[in-house]
């Protein structure tokens, strides 16, 4: 109870000090409101409400329920509801750590999860992350329980966790991709191949069922096959700017570049001074980029002609250094998502490393980065001890890293979905080594 009380206090403080409802929360809220009041899964505009598929229905469904219970657009109530889900996630992670190691590891995981400011901070903004973490935690606990006692009710709980995780975010589908085969891999040794195969297949098939009506709706409304959500969050017929995106992938490695360059594309001015030195391979390329930015800034619109010029510039840069494009920059983006100070929801400068401009914020960000690193190191120690189901945990993390390496615009929140596993493994690190039983894969 002390851990949960401390965790609740931390989350309430974030809601009081750093609430955030601008941007994506309002997009989700608009969809939920139109869905509830008008029966249209869509966004509002000057011309009325138009259907959309840029967001999956999992989080708007949650907001609809909150709006019905607590009042329309009562986002504070949404945040406090998310606190309850996040604390439940802490308990589920603790239960999972106890199952893969010991009671001591479970207690350690509970405290680590409850007092983690990185996950707690996301309860203060109406976004998918808190519910996604809950689904992952529920899946981990149900997975371990199913392999201890293979009852069909845990198959149904797992299927719910898999499907709702994917209904919240398309990358949530990785949970089923990692754990469904693991049911067979681990369970066949204990309970026989036949039963575990039936359970794994049933779980996988049930987790797909909610996407049937969503896919049919998208086909009926937009005449496209879209079982998840589009990569670039665009409705059919809207431009995706492949040239600009490809050029961005030759430049961006951190959140500052994502914010100042990628998100400003087609919405705001682009400033050459915001680009890092790696954006130019030669003085001629610097001049070419400057001219391209100047032409774009005349209207702040990526026209087909502007996009084609970005594509040519990207092709030139890839030809100059293919290793940088295909290996070095993806690895750098991945490292930034894991190691960057997780201050994206705090009122901290994006360029946190510029000490002369804001020394106090730089020092705070460095401390935040050190805390993040401590969690990662503890998790690595726990993984080294190789508790039960470590293979499944590692498979999920590696699958997620492989997916994130394909992104052109890194954000630290994309690695947050690995934190339930990190909490459990870090809990194992606090186990007494003399008491720890090193278990097989």
Question: What positions do the PLM features span?
Answer:
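Extracytosolic helix-loop segments that constitute the early lumenal/periplasmic catalytic or substrate-binding loops
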Residues: 9-14, 26-51, 58-61, 65-66
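Membrane-interface transmembrane helices that cradle and orient dolichyl/undecaprenyl
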Residues: 103, 139-155, 184-190, 430-433
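Membrane-interface anchor segments at the N-terminal boundary of transmembrane helices
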Residues: 76-77, 299-300, 308-312, 316-394
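Multi-pass, polyprenyl lipid-linked donor-dependent membrane glycosyltransferases
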Residues: 23-26, 54, 77-85, 108-143, ...
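Loop-to-helix entry region of an early transmembrane alpha helix in multi-pass inner-membrane enzymes
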Residues: 57, 61, 69-91, 110, ...
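Membrane-proximal stem/loop segments at transmembrane-domain junctions that anchor or position
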Residues: 227-343
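Transmembrane-helix signature of polytopic, membrane-embedded enzymes
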Residues: 2, 77, 90-115, 133-134, ...
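Transmembrane-helix motifs of polytopic, lipid-linked glycan transferases
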Residues: 80-101, 138, 142, 377-381
């Amino acid at each position: 109870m002390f851990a949960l009380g401390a965790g609740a206090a931390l989350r309430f403080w974030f809601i009081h000090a750093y609430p955030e409802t601008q941007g994506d929360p309002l997009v989700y809220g608009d969809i939920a409101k139109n869905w509830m009041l008008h029966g249209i899964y869509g966004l509002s505009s000057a011309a009325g409400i138009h259907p959309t598929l840029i967001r999956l229905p999992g989080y708007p469904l949650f907001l609809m329920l909150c709006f019905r219970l607590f009042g329309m657009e009562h986002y504070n109530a949404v945040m406090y509801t998310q606190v309850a889900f996040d604390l439940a996630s802490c308990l589920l992670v603790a239960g999972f750590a106890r199952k893969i190691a010991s009671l001591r590891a479970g207690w350690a995981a509970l405290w680590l999860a409850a007092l983690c400011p990185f996950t707690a901070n996301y309860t203060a903004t109406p976004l998918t992350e808190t519910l996604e973490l809950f689904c992952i935690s529920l899946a981990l606990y149900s997975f371990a329980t199913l392999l201890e006692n293979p009852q069909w009710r845990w198959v149904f709980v797992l299927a719910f966790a898999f499907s709702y995780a994917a209904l919240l975010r398309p990358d949530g589908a990785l949970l089923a991709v990692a754990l469904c085969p693991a049911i067979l891999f681990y369970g066949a040794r204990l309970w026989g191949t036949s039963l575990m195969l039936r359970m794994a297949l049933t779980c996988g098939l049930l987790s797909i069922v909610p996407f049937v009506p969503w896919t049919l709706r998208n086909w009926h409304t937009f005449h496209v096959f879209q079982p998840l959500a589009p990569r670039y969050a665009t409705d059919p017929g809207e431009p995706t700017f492949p040239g600009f995106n490809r050029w961005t992938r030759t430049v961006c490695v951190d959140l500052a570049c994502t914010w100042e360059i990628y998100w400003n594309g087609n919405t705001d001015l682009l400033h050459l001074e915001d680009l890092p030195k790696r954006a130019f391979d030669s003085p001629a390329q610097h001049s070419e980029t400057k001219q391209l930015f100047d032409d774009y800034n005349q209207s702040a619109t990526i026209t087909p002609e502007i996009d084609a010029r970005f594509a040519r510039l990207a092709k030139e840069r890839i030809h100059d250094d293919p290793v940088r494009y295909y290996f070095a920059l993806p690895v750098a983006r991945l490292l930034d998502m894991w190691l960057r100070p997780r201050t994206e929801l705090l009122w901290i400068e994006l360029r946190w490393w510029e000490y002369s401009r804001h020394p106090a914020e730089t020092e705070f960000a460095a401390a935040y980065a050190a805390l993040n690193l401590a969690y990662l190191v503890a998790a690595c120690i726990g993984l080294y001890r190789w508790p039960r189901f470590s293979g499944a945990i590692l498979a999920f993390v590696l699958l997620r890293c492989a997916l994130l390496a394909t992104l052109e615009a890194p954000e630290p929140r994309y690695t947050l979905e690995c934190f339930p596993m990190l909490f459990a493994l870090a809990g194992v690190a606090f186990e007494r080594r003399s008491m720890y039983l090193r278990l097989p894969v």
